[in-house]
């Protein structure tokens, strides 16, 4: 429903719906009323991103406007205290205060005019170049192994001097350089526009994917907010932050496949005599850097725009964008940048008193856990040891003693880990805990200082050098043909993979050995017969606490946040409940546009797709018959979700053998979600073309947790029905799940809980993982106010209050309850309701 009125002016570019106003009010009030945490669920398709932008930016501009007087009043008091003139008349103080406000306002006006001017000049220059057909390509041509004969010297690491004076001198020089830069920056800041220094409170918007962050930029372009002063036009100061891989414009560096290699290649290039052609010495003092920063603030630009701007100005976007951070009001950035303290320090991101917004937060616990977790296998270790030996044999005589000794130590540690894996692989089971001392038992590994070895790996950047050399040798064969290098994905590729090379994985694992914490555990896992040694962060609240403590307010937003209890239990257990505000809004669609049917049985067959019962042939036949009837009644697209690829394959094979699939195919063309993510787009395009262009029916068999359930939107005819088969519980016997549940139970007992309490909390955690996946999958179908669909939840457990209470609010309130105890009547009722639904709504 479109709202007639709004509680306050949020400067929404459109007339907001009631639920959008409710969400904006909830966000604004959470910040304004001093809550530390806000949890917000707003279904996908309800304009969530715009609501977040409008409420948070309206609060920020209101805060800046209301606090100008307070800040200038404090400044006046400081001036009079320092000058010992407290007896000045009040009217003199007010006049002085007014002059400061006016000067601040005038400086802001001056800066706004300056940004207008440089953006206009930039646009004019760009047009002239286009008219003259001058193509500005400042990038270097990619230097590939095939096209350029790189000197073997380029594969040597920097000389490493362990505990030597040379190392100390280098560290001292680095410290001196940093201090000089700090002082220069201080002087420069004095010379720049005063009274409009950095924004007092910043908004950090973080999301999972590059496309989601780009969508945020595009939504921000639609908005225009009240100024910090009256009678002033003030643009939104926004900067998107990205990785080197996204922002680097040096093709020599960009050509490296993965993030870590790009990072190391960039730093390696800077150490060379001539450095990088796009990064001037003392770049923060460069006028071109300042021009880049000012232009980046002059209008809303996304990552691609910054990349293009860097090419036009011949300056590095990755480093230059930092120049504008102080003036920025709102910054978008990927999860890794906000959650890793070291990354925030490198980027000089001060989150103190800031507003931090985490979008798509339904998976945030898993994201933080995976960022600080790692596993290794014997196959990986064998490949790394082989690569290290090849490299050492090649460059042995050219390596200095520090590099040579530490490389041998690295090989030794890898061999110890390999022996430990091979020795125990036959007698361990998933979830068995591993003690560090057991790894080095009966070996000399404990004599190796792993912390110093880590310092060597970090400072020498040798992992990147070895990876580059091995990649070169593997890309060359005697007949000149190319073959792919082996990466952490386990496969090979003819081009650089996005997966991290194995050596980086092993190094990350070694670092967990040097930074042991009570929040993590080492354990065994057995996945499809492959034994791995794992480290897992068990308490993500330790990472999240630092952010919560520093920030003014942390807002977690998502389309499917239910069940919300996990966030309170595992992300911020130390935050008092009166400092946490929760809100779940309904959907923009009319109530009659969505029906939800829990399907407990079909005719006289009960549905329960538990691990023990899911292969029952009678049940699979009944599911097939149910699906045939659905495909007859639902127009155009039907999307059906199964718990796993393996189970989907089993069901499809059963239906082929029993001719069920033939009957389904007579009603709708069948599509199946591919296991290879690179083929997903092709399948989706074919599925969409058949429905939207040829106006035919199709059914898409998908998997919970796959690409279809996470990032794909099935709007309009693409999903007139969504079917969820069973409850997609994760594997209860995986090493990760066994270790996590054991940790939850132990923690509950140590906090004074009973054994029953501990088991219930562990069960809740396991169940909530399942239900968040359900909510995420079924939320794919409704994308806008005029959309309509039916959701079928096929399993008797979906009819229980315990499970229904964990569905998203907008789904739960639309559940259709069948009152008859007759199975056949229930089946008839559901089919008749389906037919009536589409007859009426169409």
From Swiss-Prot:
CC terms in the record's Gene Ontology section: chromatin; nucleus
GO BP term, pick one: interstrand cross-link repair
Family matches, as InterPro entries: ATP-dep_Helicase_C (IPR006555), DinG/Rad3-like (IPR045028), DNA/RNA_helicase_DEAH_CS (IPR002464), Helic_SF1/SF2_ATP-bd_DinG/Rad3 (IPR014013), Helicase-like_DEXD_c2 (IPR006554), Helicase/UvrB_N (IPR006935), P-loop_NTPase (IPR027417), RAD3-like_helicase_DEAD (IPR010614)
Annotated ranges, domain Helicase ATP-binding: 6-417
Reaction(s) catalysed by this chain's protein: Couples ATP hydrolysis with the unwinding of duplex DNA at the replication fork by translocating in the 5'-3' direction. This creates two antiparallel DNA single strands (ssDNA). The leading ssDNA polymer is the template for DNA polymerase III holoenzyme which synthesizes a continuous strand; ATP + H2O = ADP + phosphate + H(+)
Subcellular location: Nucleus
Positions of ATP binding: 42-49
EC number of the protein: 5.6.2.3
Annotated positions binding [4Fe-4S] cluster: 248, 266, 276, 316
GO molecular function per UniProt: ATP binding; ATP hydrolysis activity; DNA binding; DNA helicase activity; iron-sulfur cluster binding; metal ion binding
Highest taxon of the lineage: Eukaryota
Keywords: ATP-binding, Cell cycle, DNA-binding, Helicase, Hydrolase, Iron, Iron-sulfur, Isomerase, Metal-binding, Nucleotide-binding, Nucleus
Record motif DEAH box, residues: 359-362
UniProt feature, compositional bias: Low complexity: 489-499
Cofactor: [4Fe-4S] cluster
Family in the record: Belongs to the DEAD box helicase family. DEAH subfamily. DDX11/CHL1 sub-subfamily.
Function: ATP-dependent DNA helicase important for chromosome transmission and normal cell cycle progression in G(2)/M. May have a role in changing DNA topology to allow the loading of proteins involved in maintaining sister chromatid cohesion in the vicinity of the centromeres. Has a specific role in chromosome segregation during meiosis II.
Identification of the protein by name: ATP-dependent DNA helicase CHL1
Species of the source: Candida albicans (strain SC5314 / ATCC MYA-2876)
């Amino acid at each position: 429903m479109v709202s007639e009125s709004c509680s306050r002016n949020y400067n929404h570019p459109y007339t907001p719906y009631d639920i959008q106003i409710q969400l904006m009010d909830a966000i604004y009030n959470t910040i304004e009323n001093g809550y530390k945490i806000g949890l917000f669920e707003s279904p996908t398709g309800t304009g969530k991103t715009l609501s977040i932008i409008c409420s948070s930016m309206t609060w920020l501009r209101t805060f800046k406007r209301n606090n100008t007087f307070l800040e200038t009043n404090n400044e006046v008091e400081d001036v009079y205290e320092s000058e010992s003139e407290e007896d000045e008349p009040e009217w003199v103080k007010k006049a002085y205060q007014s002059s400061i406000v006016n000067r601040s306002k005038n400086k802001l006006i001056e800066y706004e005019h300056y940004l207008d001017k440089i953006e206009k000049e930039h646009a004019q220059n760009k047009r002239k170049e286009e008219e003259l057909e001058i193509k500005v390509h400042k990038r270097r041509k990619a230097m590939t192994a095939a096209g350029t004969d790189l000197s073997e010297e380029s594969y040597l690491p920097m000389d490493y001097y362990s505990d030597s004076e040379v190392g100390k001198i280098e560290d001292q020089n680095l410290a001196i350089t940093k201090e000089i830069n700090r002082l220069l920056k201080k002087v420069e800041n004095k010379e720049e526009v005063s009274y409009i220094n950095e924004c007092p409170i910043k908004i950090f918007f973080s999301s999972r994917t590059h496309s989601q962050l780009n969508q945020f930029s595009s939504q921000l372009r639609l908005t225009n907010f009240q100024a910090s002063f009256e009678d002033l036009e003030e643009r939104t100061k926004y900067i998107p932050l990205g990785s080197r891989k996204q922002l680097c414009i040096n093709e020599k560096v960009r050509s490296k496949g993965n993030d870590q290699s790009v990072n190391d290649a960039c730093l390696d290039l800077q150490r060379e005599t001539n450095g990088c052609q796009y990064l001037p010495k003392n770049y923060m003092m460069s006028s071109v850097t300042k021009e880049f920063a000012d232009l980046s603030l002059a209008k809303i630009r996304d990552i691609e725009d910054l990349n293009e701007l860097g090419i036009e100005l011949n300056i590095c976007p990755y480093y230059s964008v930092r120049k504008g951070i102080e003036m920025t009001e709102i910054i978008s950035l990927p999860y890794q940048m906000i959650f890793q303290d070291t990354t925030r320090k490198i980027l000089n991101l001060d989150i103190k008193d800031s507003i931090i917004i985490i979008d798509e937060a339904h998976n945030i616990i898993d994201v933080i856990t995976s960022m600080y977790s790692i596993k290794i296998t014997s196959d990986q270790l064998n490949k790394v040891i082989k690569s290290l030996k090849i490299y050492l044999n090649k460059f042995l005589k050219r390596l200095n003693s520090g590099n040579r000794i530490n490389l041998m130590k690295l090989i030794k540690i890898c061999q110890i880990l390999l022996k430990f894996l091979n020795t125990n692989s036959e007698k361990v089971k998933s979830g068995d805990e591993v003690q560090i001392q057991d790894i080095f038992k009966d070996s000399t590994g404990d004599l190796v200082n792993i912390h110093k070895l880590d310092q060597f790996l970090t400072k020498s950047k040798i992992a990147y050098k070895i990876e580059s050399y091995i990649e070169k040798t593997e890309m060359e064969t005697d007949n000149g043909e190319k073959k792919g290098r082996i990466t952490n994905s386990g496969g090979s590729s003819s081009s650089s993979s996005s997966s991290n090379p194995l050596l980086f994985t092993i190094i990350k694992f070694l670092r967990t050995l040097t930074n042991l914490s009570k929040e993590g555990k080492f354990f065994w896992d057995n996945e499809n017969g492959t034994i791995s040694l794992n480290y897992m962060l068990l308490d993500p609240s330790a990472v999240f606490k630092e952010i919560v403590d520093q920030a003014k307010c942390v807002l977690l937003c998502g389309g499917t946040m239910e069940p919300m209890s996990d966030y309170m239990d595992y992300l911020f257990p130390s935050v008092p409940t009166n400092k946490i505000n929760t809100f779940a809004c309904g959907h923009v669609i009319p109530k009659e546009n969505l029906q939800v049917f829990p399907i407990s049985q079909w005719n006289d067959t009960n549905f329960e797709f538990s691990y023990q019962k899911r292969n029952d042939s009678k049940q699979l036949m009944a599911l097939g018959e149910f699906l045939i009837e659905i495909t007859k009644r639902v127009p155009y697209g039907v999307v059906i979700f199964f718990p796993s690829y393996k189970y989907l394959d089993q069901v499809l094979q059963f239906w082929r053998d029993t001719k069920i699939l033939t009957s389904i195919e007579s009603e709708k063309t069948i599509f199946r979600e591919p296991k290879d993510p690179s083929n997903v787009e092709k399948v989706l395009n074919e599925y969409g073309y058949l429905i939207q262009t040829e106006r035919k029916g199709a059914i898409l068999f998908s998997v919970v947790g796959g690409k279809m359930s996470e990032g794909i939107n099935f709007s309009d005819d693409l999903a007139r029905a969504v079917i969820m088969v069973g409850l997609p519980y994760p594997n209860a016997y995986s090493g990760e799940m066994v270790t996590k549940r054991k940790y939850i139970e132990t923690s509950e007992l140590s906090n004074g809980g009973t054994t029953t309490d501990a088991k219930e909390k562990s069960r809740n955690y396991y169940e909530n993982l399942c239900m968040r996946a359900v909510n995420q999958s079924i939320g794919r179908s409704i994308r806008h106010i005029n959309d309509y669909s039916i959701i079928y939840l096929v399993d008797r457990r979906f009819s229980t209050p315990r499970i229904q209470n964990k569905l998203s609010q907008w789904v739960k309130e639309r559940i259709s309850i069948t009152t008859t105890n007759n199975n056949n009547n229930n089946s008839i009722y559901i089919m008749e309701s389906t037919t009536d639904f589409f007859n009426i709504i169409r």
